[in-house]
């Protein structure tokens, strides 16, 4: 195009206030305009809340979102990662990671992890160490001597496991006992299975006087046993569905979404990250179960 022609086009663009089609922009930049968001299960209260915030944040950058629901299936997880490798996604935000570290480390595409600690992959997560300390201090304040806490059902290195470790440290310093139990993923997202497991555990540990569990499990304990101190961990809408409002350690899903999207956009645009790990503070929400 001649210089005269360029000037005519520029003038027409200015007069018409023309905004180039986003699809054309993406085509020019060799991008798809799509971000994959990988979740263990969209039915989980915290993840469904987080994904809503992620979608809103990504929309501000002109990105569409594809929810990649793995249900803990490694084959499905591998399929979504292959989709990223084939350039069908511009980037991936991972809330579910069951494949090996090596599998992720061999992918040279923009990835942000939301919990799993993977060498070389940037991490955005709640400050679970702070959450565990808060929980321990609350149980001590209420005079609890034996607390039951639920760990994540996977054996992977997860940032969220810090909450259990910090709780144990706080309680043991005061000669209090912490029992660690794990729910299977199906029990975490299925209320009936959760109820069945809670009854079994209460029969097994009748002298437990404090319980820290994910929101749905905490709600199940509340329905089964009202004489124990119950603290939910996540602090989603589930904690307000009962006759009693459940005391909660609340993860700031909105801030987690904002920080993870900001980091991912920088990776996509080949911009340097000031830090490769972001911890988002948690807070205590008072209810009437402690």
Language-model regions: role of each:
Residues 1-31:
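N-terminal helix-turn-helix DNA-binding module of bacterial transcription factors
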Residues 30-137, 202-203, 207-210, 227:
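Alpha-helical recognition/docking segments in bacterial nutrient-uptake
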Residues 58-69, 164, 168-193:
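Short beta-strand elements in bilobed, periplasmic/extracellular small-molecule ligand-binding domains
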Residues 103-109, 168-173, 221-229:
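Glycosyltransferases and closely related glycan-assembly transferases
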Residues 124-149, 191-199, 250-270:
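Hydrophobic alpha-helical segments within soluble ligand-binding/sensing domains
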Residues 135-181, 272-290:
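An alpha-beta-alpha
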Residues 199, 204-212, 217-290:
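Flexible loop/turn connectors
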């Amino acid at each position: 195009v001649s210089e005269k022609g360029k000037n005519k086009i520029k003038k027409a663009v200015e007069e018409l206030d023309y905004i180039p089609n986003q699809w054309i922009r993406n085509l020019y930049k060799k991008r798809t305009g799509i971000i994959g968001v990988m979740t263990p299960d969209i039915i989980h209260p915290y993840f469904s809340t987080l994904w809503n915030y992620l979608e809103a944040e990504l929309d501000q950058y002109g990105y569409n979102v594809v929810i990649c629901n793995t249900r803990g299936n490694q084959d499905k997880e591998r399929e979504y990662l292959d989709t990223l490798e084939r350039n069908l996604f511009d980037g991936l935000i991972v809330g579910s990671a069951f494949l090996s570290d090596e599998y992720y480390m061999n992918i040279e595409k923009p990835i942000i992890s939301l919990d799993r600690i993977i060498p070389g992959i940037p991490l955005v997560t709640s400050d679970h160490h702070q959450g565990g300390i808060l929980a321990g201090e609350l149980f001590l304040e209420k005079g609890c001597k034996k607390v039951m806490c639920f760990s994540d059902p996977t054996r992977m290195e997860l940032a969220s496991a810090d909450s259990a470790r910090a709780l144990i440290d706080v309680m043991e310093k005061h000669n209090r006992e912490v029992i660690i139990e794990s729910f299977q993923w199906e029990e975490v997202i299925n209320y009936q299975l959760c109820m069945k497991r809670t009854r079994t555990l209460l029969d097994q540990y009748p002298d437990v006087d404090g319980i820290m569990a994910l929101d749905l499990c905490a709600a199940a304990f509340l329905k089964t046993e009202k004489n124990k101190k119950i603290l939910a961990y996540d602090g989603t809408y589930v904690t307000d569905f009962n006759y009693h409002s459940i005391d909660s350690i609340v993860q700031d899903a909105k801030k987690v979404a904002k920080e993870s999207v900001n980091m991912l956009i920088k990776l996509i645009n080949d911009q340097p990250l000031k830090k490769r790990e972001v911890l988002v503070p948690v807070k205590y929400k008072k209810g009437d179960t402690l």
